[in-house]
Amino acid sequence: MNHVINFVLKNKFAVWLMTIIVTAAGLYAGMNMKQESIPDVNMPYLTISTTYPGATPSQVADEVTKPVEQAVQNLDGVSVVTSTSYENASSVMIEYDYEKDMDKAKTEAAEALENVNLPDDAKDPEISRYSLNSFPILTLSVSSDKDNLQELTKQVEDSLVSKLEGIEGVASVQVSGQQVEEVEFSFKEDKLKEYGLDEDTVKQVIQGSDVTTPLGLYTFGNEEKSVVVSGDIETIKDLKNMRIPTASASSAGSSAASQAGAQSAQAAQSAQAAAQVQQSASTAVPTVKLSDIATIKDVKKAESVSRTNGKDSIGINIVKANDANTVEVADDVKAELKKFKEDHKGFNYSATLDMAEPITQSVDTMLSKAIFGAIFAIVIILLFLRDIKSTLISVVSIPLSLLIALLVLQQLDITLNIMTLGAMTVAIGRVVDDSIVVIENIYRRMRLKDEPLRGKALVREATKEMFKPIMSSTIVTIAVFLPLALVGGQIGELFIPFALTIVFALAASLVISITLVPMLAHSLFKKSLTGAPIKAKEHKPGRLANIYKKVLNWALSHKWITSIIAVLMLLGSLFLVPLIGASYLPSEEEKTMQLTYSPEPGETKKEAENEAEKAEKILLDRKHVDTVQYSLGSGSPLAGGDSNGALFYIKYESDTPDFDKEKDNVLKEIQKQSDRGEWKSQDFSSSGNNNELTYYVYGDSENDIKDTVKDIEKIMKDEKDLKNVNSGLSSTYDEYTFVADQEKLSKLGLTASQISQALMSQTSQEPLTTVKKDGKELDVNIKTEKDEYKSVKDLENKKITSATGQEVKIGDVAKVKEGSTSDTVSKRDGKVYADVTGEVTSDNVTAVSAAIQKKIDKLDHPDNVSIDTGGVSADIADSFTKLGLAMLAAIAIVYLVLVITFGGALAPFAILFSLPFTVIGALVGLYVSGETISLNAMIGMLMLIGIVVTNAIVLIDRVIHKEAEGLSTREALLEAGSTRLRPILMTAIATIGALIPLALGFEGGSQVISKGLGVTVIGGLISSTLLTLLIVPIVYEVLAKFRKKKPGTEEE
C-alpha cells in the first residue's frame, strides 16, 4: 500500500495525465454506446410454422401438429411444447431452459423435423426464433394529398422501400395496405362447354407449358454443354395467345387425368398436356386461343387494408437488426422520410409506434436523476465537511468512477439502457463513500493538535489507515451482486448489466480513493500539511458526537432494553407486509394503445372491415386522440395471425388525463358496439403487460375442460380488481363434409380427388403461373368467388367432367354431412388446454391472486382436468424465490469476505447484525410511499446488504484499532463511535441524497429502476444506520467476552 501512495505522491503529473486520458476515453465511450430500452435478453423460444392448405384445425392437429410435437418434445433442453392448430396452418412453440444455446437448438430442431412424415400437400415446416428484435421499432403510416393509392404504392415500392432497406441497421421493411398488381384469370364457362374443355385440363396445360427443365450436360464434338428446355410464358400477351387443344385432342389426356386420381399424378398430367400442345401443332389437331375461353386482365388491388385517421394509407413496419441501435436506426429512418417528403410533394408520414421515444425519454430522465442526485450528494458533503477543498476532492470520484464504468461497459459491448443508467444513478451515492472516508481522515488528522506527522507522511498514513475498511466495504458491496449472475433466467439476464455497472463503478471509486484523492489532498492542502496544525475545534468531538456517545453508553449499559425495543420494531414492521402487498413490476405509462380484432369463425373480410370502420369512428371521436392507424387482412402475427384480423395503433396527446381509465372506457365502448368477433387491448412495449393473471386448464379434450374454463372465467369477471378477462376456449363453426359415393364415381370414371380439385378452385390457392411486366414478375391468379355462395347447395350443383366428357353434379356423386369443428386446437405438453387471462388493476397483485385462487380451489372439476397458474402470479413466485436465494448467498459471501478481512469470526458476526434492521425502514418507506413489494424493491433490499454493512465495517475497524492500542472494549466502542459518527452519517446521507430524485419518482424513466427501489434503499439505510450505531456495538461487546485471544489481536 505504501508503494502505491508514494508513487502517486511522487508522480502527480503522471496521475493528472492518466486522469485526463481516462476522462476523455470515458466521455467518448459514453457518447458512442448503443442505446436500448432494456438489455438484450435471451428469449429461449422457437416457433415451428407449417402450412397445410385446405385442412380443418382438427386435421392440422392430427396430421401436422402431432408429428411435429413428437419430433421435438424430447430434444435436449426442451422445457414446454405448446401448439395451436388453425385452419390451414400449425404453430408449435418450444420453450427451452434459459441456459440453452438457441443457435444449436434451432439446428437440432431442424434435424429432428427432417424425419417427420407430413401430408403431401403440407408445406415444409419453417423454424423461427422468438426475439424482442422481431417486433417493429417503428410503425409508420404514409399517405399523399396529391397521388391516389396506386401512385403512392408505386412511390413506396419503387423508391422509398429500397431507401429504407439501405439504412444501416434495418433488417426488414414490411409494407401493408399497398396496391398489388397481378394478372386476374377467370374462365368463360359457356366457352369451355363449347370446346368440350374443363378448368382442370386447361390449368394443367398452362402449368405444363410454363416450365424450365435443365437436362444436364450433352457432348457436342469435343465439348460438353448444358441443355435446358424453357417453356417460360414471358408476357400477358404470350399467355393470351397460348393455344389449348380442344376436346378431341384432350380426351386422351382427360381420360388419363381422371384415371390418375390422386394429386401425386399432377406433374405427369401437366407434362402430358404440354405434349398434346406440341402434337396438335404438328398434326393439325384443333386448338383454341386461351383468351377465347378465359378473361385475362392486369388488375391492381389492395391485399390488405391500411387507414390512418379515416383516410386510406400505406402502413410500413421497420424491424431492426439484432445488433443495431434502436435510437440510431429510428432517427436515420425519420431523417430519410423527411428527405423523401421534401422531394415528393403531397407526401405525408406519421409514426404511430416509435420504440425510440420511450428509450430516449428513459435515458434523459435517468440522466437528470443522476445529475440531481450528484448535486444532493455534493451539498450534503459540503454541509458536513464545511470545507470546499475537501468537498471537491470527495466529489471528483463521482464523474470519474462513472466514466471508467462506461469505458469498461463499452468494451464489453453492453448497451446504455435503463438498467445501466439506473445502476449509475444508484451508484452515485456509493462511489463517493470511499473518497469521503479517506479525505475525512486526512482532514481530521491534519487538524489534530497532537498529530506527529506532517506533509506526505500524514497523507500516506491517513490513507493507509482507512484502506482496509474501504477495501473490505467495497469488496462486500461488489460481492452482494455476484449471486445475481447465478440467479439465471430472465431476471439474471436483465440485472447482470445493472450489477456489472455498479461493480465497475465501485472498483473505480476504490482505486480513485487511494490514488487521486491523496494526490489532490497533498496538492490542495499543501500549506496546511507542511505548516503548524490549524487552530480549530475539530480535534474535539462535536456536539452530535457527544450526544451519540452518551446514548451509546446508556445502550451498552442497558443491553436488554435496547435490544428488545429494536426487535419489537422489527417484528412490528413485518405486520405492514399484507398492507403493502406485492406486484411484479410497476406499470409503465406510455400514451399509446394497441387494439386487435379477431373475427369470429366464418366471418368474411367485408364484415371484418365493417367492424374495424365502426371502431375507427369511435376512436376518432374521442377527445385527446392524436392518431388512429389500423391495418386489416395483413395476417400479421401481432394481430393474432388471422387473415381477416385487424391491428390498431392509437396515439394519444401527451397530456391525456387518467389514461388508464381512458383505455378501459374506449375498449368497453368498442366491445359494446361489436356484435361479431373479439376486441382486445394489447401491450407491445418492451416490458409487456406486467400485471396479467393467467390460469391454464388442462384435460384430455376440449369438452372435458369447457365447464371448468367457464367457471374460472366467471370467478375472474366477478372480481372488481380485474379487467379484460378472456378465455382461450376455441369457437366452433359449421363444417360440411362431402362423403363420396365410390360406386357411382367408379362407374363414371371419376375419383374423389376430382371433387376436391373442383371445390378447391373456389378457395385461395397458389398462383397458376407468373408473367413479366416492366421488369417485374406478376402472379397469375384464378379469380375465385369465395364470398358469393348462398348455401352449400351451390357447391353441390357444381359440375365435374367424367372420362367420357359427361358433366356430373357433385351432389349426384357425394352426400353432404353437416357437423361442426373448432376454429383452433391448442395443446401444451401434449394435453389439450385453454387459458383464462385477466389484467389486475390493483397494485396489490398477490392479494387479488390469493382471493381468486381461494375460489378456484373450491371448484368441483373432473379428475382428468387440472388447473395451473401462470402470468404475473407465477412471475412473482419465481422472481421472489430466486432473489430470496440470491440474498442468502449474498449474506454468506459478505460474511466470508469479512472473516478474511478481519482475520476472525466474531467481529464479522457482530457486523452482520446491522442487516435485519434494514427491513424496518424499507417496509415503512414502501408503506408511506404507496409502493408495493416488487422486483425493484427486492433489488433494493439486495443492494442494502452491501451498503449497510460498510457503515458497521468503518465502526468496528476503528474499535479493533483502539483495542490494539490498549483501550478496553467499552472505551474503544465509545471512542470509535464518536470518531466514526461523521463519516458514517456523511456516507449514509450522501447515498440517501443521491437517491432522492429516484424516490420522488420524477416523470418518465423506467419500470425496473424506479421509485420502489429508491424508497427501499433510503428507508432501509435510515433505519439500519440509526440501529447499527447501537445494536452492532452491543453485539460486539457481548461477543468480546467469548474471545479466547486478547483484544486487538485480530488482524489490523
Swiss-Prot record:
Covalent S-S links between cysteines: none
GO CC terms: plasma membrane
Keyword terms, alphabetized: Antibiotic resistance
Gene Ontology molecular-function annotations: xenobiotic transmembrane transporter activity
GO biological process terms on file: response to antibiotic
InterPro entries registered for this protein in UniProt: AcrB_DN_DC_subdom (IPR027463), Acrflvin-R (IPR001036)
TM helices/strands, residue ranges: none
Similarity field: Belongs to the resistance-nodulation-cell division (RND) (TC 2.A.6) family.
Name of the protein described by the UniProt record: Swarming motility protein SwrC
The species this protein was found in: Bacillus subtilis (strain 168)
Source lineage: Bacteria, Bacillati, Bacillota, Bacilli, Bacillales
